Protein backbone atom coordinates (compact mmCIF):
# COMPACT_ATOMS: atom_id res chain seq x y z
CA UNK A 1 0.00 0.00 0.00
CA UNK A 2 1.40 3.39 -1.04
CA UNK A 3 1.83 6.47 1.10
CA UNK A 4 -1.27 8.12 -0.42
CA UNK A 5 -3.37 5.03 0.38
CA UNK A 6 -2.23 5.09 3.99
CA UNK A 7 -3.18 8.76 4.17
CA UNK A 8 -6.66 7.93 2.91
CA UNK A 9 -7.04 5.15 5.48
CA UNK A 10 -5.85 7.46 8.26
CA UNK A 11 -8.21 10.23 7.16
CA UNK A 12 -11.15 7.82 7.00
CA UNK A 13 -10.35 6.49 10.47
CA UNK A 14 -10.06 9.98 11.90
CA UNK A 15 -13.35 10.95 10.28
CA UNK A 16 -15.08 7.90 11.74
CA UNK A 17 -13.72 8.65 15.21
CA UNK A 18 -14.97 12.23 15.01
CA UNK A 19 -18.38 11.05 13.81
CA UNK A 20 -18.69 8.59 16.69
CA UNK A 21 -17.63 11.27 19.16
CA UNK A 22 -20.26 13.65 17.80
CA UNK A 23 -23.06 11.06 17.76
CA UNK A 24 -24.21 11.56 21.40
CA UNK A 25 -24.30 15.32 20.87
CA UNK A 26 -26.28 14.87 17.66
CA UNK A 27 -28.80 12.60 19.39
CA UNK A 28 -29.25 15.12 22.21
CA UNK A 29 -29.76 17.87 19.64
CA UNK A 30 -32.35 15.86 17.73
CA UNK A 31 -34.23 14.94 20.90
CA UNK A 32 -34.14 18.51 22.14
CA UNK A 33 -35.67 19.65 18.87
CA UNK A 34 -38.51 17.11 18.97
CA UNK A 35 -41.75 18.52 20.26
CA UNK A 36 -43.06 16.65 23.33
CA UNK A 37 -46.32 14.84 22.86
CA UNK A 38 -49.48 16.78 23.70
CA UNK A 39 -52.79 15.16 22.83
CA UNK A 40 -56.31 15.68 24.14
CA UNK A 41 -59.07 13.11 23.62
CA UNK A 42 -62.74 13.74 24.17
CA UNK A 43 -65.44 11.19 24.81
CA UNK A 44 -67.94 9.66 24.12
CA UNK A 45 -65.91 7.94 21.42
CA UNK A 46 -67.25 7.00 18.04
CA UNK A 47 -67.80 3.24 17.92
CA UNK A 48 -65.13 1.85 15.59
CA UNK A 49 -63.43 -1.48 14.99
CA UNK A 50 -60.25 -1.91 17.05
CA UNK A 51 -59.42 -5.50 16.08
CA UNK A 52 -56.48 -4.56 13.86
CA UNK A 53 -54.86 -2.68 16.73
CA UNK A 54 -55.41 -5.43 19.26
CA UNK A 55 -54.32 -8.31 17.01
CA UNK A 56 -51.34 -6.64 15.38
CA UNK A 57 -50.09 -3.66 17.42
CA UNK A 58 -48.54 -0.93 15.32
CA UNK A 59 -50.52 -1.61 12.16
CA UNK A 60 -53.19 0.86 11.06
CA UNK A 61 -56.74 -0.46 11.27
CA UNK A 62 -58.27 -1.47 7.97
CA UNK A 63 -61.13 -3.51 6.54
CA UNK A 64 -58.77 -6.31 5.52
CA UNK A 65 -58.05 -7.09 9.16
CA UNK A 66 -61.65 -7.58 10.26
CA UNK A 67 -64.83 -8.27 8.25
CA UNK A 68 -67.14 -6.56 10.75
CA UNK A 69 -69.45 -3.74 9.67
CA UNK A 70 -68.11 -1.17 12.16
CA UNK A 71 -66.21 1.83 10.76
CA UNK A 72 -62.48 1.19 10.43
CA UNK A 73 -61.40 4.71 11.30
CA UNK A 74 -59.66 6.62 14.06
CA UNK A 75 -61.57 7.42 17.24
CA UNK A 76 -60.77 8.60 20.74
CA UNK A 77 -60.70 4.98 21.91
CA UNK A 78 -58.34 3.87 19.13
CA UNK A 79 -56.00 6.77 19.89
CA UNK A 80 -56.00 5.83 23.57
CA UNK A 81 -55.24 2.23 22.62
CA UNK A 82 -52.33 3.36 20.43
CA UNK A 83 -50.89 5.40 23.29
CA UNK A 84 -51.01 2.34 25.56
CA UNK A 85 -49.69 -0.11 22.97
CA UNK A 86 -46.65 2.13 22.43
CA UNK A 87 -45.29 0.88 25.78
CA UNK A 88 -42.00 -1.00 25.45
CA UNK A 89 -40.77 -1.46 29.02
CA UNK A 90 -43.34 -0.49 31.67
CA UNK A 91 -46.96 0.48 32.24
CA UNK A 92 -48.38 1.75 35.52
CA UNK A 93 -52.18 1.89 35.80
CA UNK A 94 -54.00 3.61 38.65
CA UNK A 95 -57.71 3.26 37.90
CA UNK A 96 -60.92 3.55 39.87
CA UNK A 97 -62.90 1.29 37.51
CA UNK A 98 -61.66 -0.93 34.68
CA UNK A 99 -64.22 -2.88 32.66
CA UNK A 100 -63.48 -1.99 29.01
CA UNK A 101 -62.74 -5.26 27.13
CA UNK A 102 -60.65 -3.45 24.49
CA UNK A 103 -58.45 -1.71 27.04
CA UNK A 104 -58.18 -4.94 29.01
CA UNK A 105 -56.99 -6.81 25.92
CA UNK A 106 -54.43 -4.08 25.21
CA UNK A 107 -52.99 -4.39 28.72
CA UNK A 108 -52.78 -8.18 28.39
CA UNK A 109 -51.03 -7.81 25.01
CA UNK A 110 -48.41 -5.59 26.62
CA UNK A 111 -47.91 -8.13 29.40
CA UNK A 112 -47.44 -10.88 26.80
CA UNK A 113 -44.84 -8.73 25.02
CA UNK A 114 -42.79 -8.55 28.22
CA UNK A 115 -43.83 -5.07 29.35
CA UNK A 116 -43.88 -4.78 33.15
CA UNK A 117 -47.48 -3.95 34.03
CA UNK A 118 -48.64 -2.90 37.51
CA UNK A 119 -52.23 -2.05 38.35
CA UNK A 120 -53.73 -0.18 41.31
CA UNK A 121 -57.51 -0.16 41.61
CA UNK A 122 -60.47 0.26 43.97
CA UNK A 123 -61.40 -2.88 45.89
CA UNK A 124 -65.17 -2.37 45.61
CA UNK A 125 -65.28 -1.63 41.89
CA UNK A 126 -62.86 -4.42 40.97
CA UNK A 127 -65.50 -6.87 42.23
CA UNK A 128 -68.28 -5.57 39.98
CA UNK A 129 -69.60 -7.70 37.13
CA UNK A 130 -67.57 -7.12 33.95
CA UNK A 131 -64.43 -5.86 35.68
CA UNK A 132 -61.21 -6.69 33.84
CA UNK A 133 -59.18 -6.98 37.04
CA UNK A 134 -59.78 -10.70 37.53
CA UNK A 135 -58.67 -11.42 33.95
CA UNK A 136 -55.53 -9.34 34.42
CA UNK A 137 -54.66 -11.19 37.61
CA UNK A 138 -55.30 -14.53 35.91
CA UNK A 139 -52.88 -13.48 33.17
CA UNK A 140 -50.18 -12.93 35.81
CA UNK A 141 -50.34 -9.14 36.04
CA UNK A 142 -49.64 -7.58 39.44
CA UNK A 143 -52.69 -5.88 40.96
CA UNK A 144 -53.01 -4.06 44.27
CA UNK A 145 -56.09 -2.45 45.79
CA UNK A 146 -57.10 -0.28 48.71
CA UNK A 147 -58.43 -1.37 52.09
CA UNK A 148 -59.37 1.97 53.60
CA UNK A 149 -62.49 4.09 53.93
CA UNK A 150 -62.16 6.28 50.85
CA UNK A 151 -62.35 5.37 47.19
CA UNK A 152 -59.19 4.81 45.17
CA UNK A 153 -60.50 7.35 42.67
CA UNK A 154 -57.41 8.08 40.54
CA UNK A 155 -57.59 7.65 36.77
CA UNK A 156 -54.12 7.74 35.25
CA UNK A 157 -51.55 5.65 33.42
CA UNK A 158 -47.80 6.08 32.89
CA UNK A 159 -46.20 4.61 29.75
CA UNK A 160 -42.48 3.78 29.88
CA UNK A 161 -42.09 6.35 32.69
CA UNK A 162 -42.23 9.03 29.97
CA UNK A 163 -45.86 9.53 28.93
CA UNK A 164 -48.71 10.45 31.26
CA UNK A 165 -52.33 9.56 30.43
CA UNK A 166 -54.88 11.12 32.74
CA UNK A 167 -58.30 12.74 32.81
CA UNK A 168 -61.89 12.23 33.89
CA UNK A 169 -62.41 8.97 31.99
CA UNK A 170 -63.15 5.75 33.84
CA UNK A 171 -61.94 2.82 31.75
CA UNK A 172 -65.43 1.42 31.29
CA UNK A 173 -67.56 0.84 28.21
CA UNK A 174 -70.24 3.11 29.69
CA UNK A 175 -67.82 6.02 30.03
CA UNK A 176 -66.14 5.45 26.66
CA UNK A 177 -69.34 5.19 24.62
CA UNK A 178 -71.78 7.40 26.53
CA UNK A 179 -70.17 9.90 28.90
CA UNK A 180 -68.74 13.36 28.32
CA UNK A 181 -65.14 12.75 29.37
CA UNK A 182 -61.62 13.92 28.63
CA UNK A 183 -58.16 12.35 28.50
CA UNK A 184 -54.83 14.17 28.30
CA UNK A 185 -51.80 12.36 26.86
CA UNK A 186 -48.57 14.21 27.48
CA UNK A 187 -44.80 13.96 27.68
CA UNK A 188 -43.70 16.19 30.53
CA UNK A 189 -40.83 15.15 32.78
CA UNK A 190 -42.06 17.00 35.85
CA UNK A 191 -45.69 15.86 35.65
CA UNK A 192 -44.67 12.27 34.93
CA UNK A 193 -42.32 12.35 37.93
CA UNK A 194 -45.06 13.58 40.27
CA UNK A 195 -47.61 11.01 39.10
CA UNK A 196 -45.02 8.23 39.26
CA UNK A 197 -44.16 9.22 42.83
CA UNK A 198 -47.86 9.07 43.71
CA UNK A 199 -48.16 5.65 42.09
CA UNK A 200 -45.16 4.28 43.97
CA UNK A 201 -46.45 5.74 47.25
CA UNK A 202 -49.84 4.05 46.81
CA UNK A 203 -48.25 0.83 45.54
CA UNK A 204 -46.23 0.61 48.76
CA UNK A 205 -49.24 1.57 50.90
CA UNK A 206 -51.39 -1.13 49.28
CA UNK A 207 -48.82 -3.87 49.87
CA UNK A 208 -51.05 -6.83 50.88
CA UNK A 209 -48.62 -7.85 53.61
CA UNK A 210 -49.67 -4.67 55.43
CA UNK A 211 -53.41 -5.35 55.33
CA UNK A 212 -55.37 -5.82 58.51
CA UNK A 213 -56.95 -9.28 58.71
CA UNK A 214 -60.47 -8.01 59.30
CA UNK A 215 -60.71 -4.61 57.60
CA UNK A 216 -63.51 -2.31 58.74
CA UNK A 217 -64.58 -0.64 55.55
CA UNK A 218 -67.66 1.51 55.21
CA UNK A 219 -68.07 4.01 52.43
CA UNK A 220 -70.43 6.80 51.70
CA UNK A 221 -70.89 8.94 48.64
Swiss-Prot record:
Q: Which residues form the PLD phosphodiesterase domain?
A: 148-175
GO CC terms for this protein?
Answer: endoplasmic reticulum membrane; Golgi apparatus; mitochondrial outer membrane; nuclear membrane; plasma membrane
Task: List the GO molecular function terms.
Answer: cardiolipin hydrolase activity; endonuclease activity; identical protein binding; phospholipase D activity; protein homodimerization activity; zinc ion binding
Consequence of gene disruption:
Males are sterile, because of meiotic arrest during spermatogenesis due to demethylation and subsequent derepression of transposable elements. No spermatids were observed in the mutant testes, and no spermatozoon in the epididymis. Effects are caused by defects in primary piRNA biogenesis: in contrast to wild-type cells neither mitochondria nor associated meiotic nuage (named P granule) are aggregated.
**Record field: transmembrane:** 5-27
Mitochondrial intermembrane-side positions: 1-4
Keyword field: Cell membrane, Differentiation, Endonuclease, Golgi apparatus, Hydrolase, Lipid degradation, Lipid metabolism, Meiosis, Membrane, Metal-binding, Mitochondrion, Mitochondrion outer membrane, Nuclease, Nucleus, Spermatogenesis, Transmembrane, Transmembrane helix, Zinc, Zinc-finger
- For this protein, what reaction is catalysed? a cardiolipin + H2O = a 1,2-diacyl-sn-glycero-3-phospho-(1'-sn-glycerol) + a 1,2-diacyl-sn-glycero-3-phosphate + H(+)
**InterPro entries, sorted:** PLD-like_dom, PLD_domain, PLipase_D/transphosphatidylase
Q: Start and end residues of each C3H1-type zinc finger?
A: 44-75
**Gene3D superfamilies in the record, alphabetically?**
Endonuclease Chain A (3.30.870.10)
Active-site annotation = 153, 155, 160
Q: In which tissues is it expressed?
A: Predominantly expressed in testis (at protein level) and in growing ovary. Also expressed in the brain, eye and urinary bladder (at protein level), but its levels were low or undetectable in other organs.
Show the SMART domains listed in the entry: PLDc (SM00155)
Membrane topology, as annotated, equals: Single-pass membrane protein
Q: Which residues lie on this side of the membrane: Cytoplasmic?
A: 28-221
Q: Where is this region: Required for mitochondrial localization?
A: 1-38
Main localisation, per the record?
mitochondrion
Give details on activation and inhibition: Single stranded DNA (ssDNA) hydrolase activity does not depend upon, but is stimulated by the presence of Ca(2+) and Mn(2+). MIGA1 and MIGA2 increase PLD6 self-association affinity and affects the homodimer conformation facilitating its phospholipase activity over the nuclease activity. MYC induces its expression and stimulates its phospholipase activity.
Family as reported in the entry's similarity comment: Belongs to the phospholipase D family. MitoPLD/Zucchini subfamily.
Please give the subunit comment from the record.
Homodimer. Interacts with MOV10L1. Interacts with MIGA1 and MIGA2; possibly facilitating homodimer formation. Interacts with GK2.
Described by its record, this protein's role is as follows: Presents phospholipase and nuclease activities, depending on the different physiological conditions. Interaction with Mitoguardin (MIGA1 or MIGA2) affects the dimer conformation, facilitating the lipase activity over the nuclease activity. Plays a key role in mitochondrial fusion and fission via its phospholipase activity. In its phospholipase role, it uses the mitochondrial lipid cardiolipin as substrate to generate phosphatidate (PA or 1,2-diacyl-sn-glycero-3-phosphate), a second messenger signaling lipid.
Protein name (database record):
Mitochondrial cardiolipin hydrolase
Q: What gene name is given for the protein in this entry?
A: Pld6
Amino acid sequence: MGRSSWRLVFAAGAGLALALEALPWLMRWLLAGRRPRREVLFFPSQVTCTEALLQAPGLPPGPSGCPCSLPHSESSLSRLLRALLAARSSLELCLFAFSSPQLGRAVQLLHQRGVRVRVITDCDYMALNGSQIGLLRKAGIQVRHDQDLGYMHHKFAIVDKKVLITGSLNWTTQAIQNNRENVLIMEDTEYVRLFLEEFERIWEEFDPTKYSFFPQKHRGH
